[in-house]
From Swiss-Prot:
Family per record: Belongs to the UPF0060 family.
Record organism: Cupriavidus metallidurans (strain ATCC 43123 / DSM 2839 / NBRC 102507 / CH34) (Ralstonia metallidurans)
Keywords linked to the UniProt accession: Cell inner membrane, Cell membrane, Membrane, Plasmid, Transmembrane, Transmembrane helix
Superkingdom per UniProt: Bacteria
The name this protein goes by in its record: UPF0060 membrane protein Rmet_4032
Localization terms from the record: Cell inner membrane
Pfam family, one: UPF0060
Lineage, opening ranks: Bacteria, Pseudomonadati, Pseudomonadota, Betaproteobacteria, Burkholderiales
InterPro entries per the UniProt record, alphabetical: UPF0060
SUPFAM superfamilies assigned to the protein according to its UniProt record, in alphabetical order: Multidrug resistance efflux transporter EmrE
């Protein structure tokens, strides 16, 4: 469970780090949002180093969690309800992530 929490925190840091520059570029927010955006991306990179597996495996498994978090962000922040296809895609991605993360060692 600790690993899944770390993946969720990593995804949140990346999404926030990308969303803040988006607010500046597309929504007219102050350029000051770039500072916490850059800090969030730095935290994201640091969090990736805390994952216990080899980097390639971490990145592959992290992709599934990122997809799930991005769809949750779509709903919570953008106010767009996910379609059944979005939910199916998340299920497939998380299934792949689970196979990679919880494989026998």
């Amino acid at each position: 469970m600790k690993t899944v929490g770390l993946y969720l925190l990593t995804a949140l840091a990346e999404i926030l780090g990308c969303y803040l520059p988006y607010l500046w570029l597309r929504q007219g927010a102050s350029p000051w949002v770039l500072l916490p955006g850059a800090a969030s991306l730095a935290v994201f990179a640091w969090l990736l180093t805390l994952h216990p597996d080899a980097s390639g495996r971490v990145y592959a498994a992290y992709g599934g969690v990122y997809i799930a978090m991005a769809i949750a962000w779509l709903w919570a922040v953008d106010g767009v309800r996910p379609s059944p296809w979005d939910i199916a895609g998340v299920a497939v991605a998380l299934g792949g992530m689970a196979i990679i993360v919880f494989q026998p060692r």
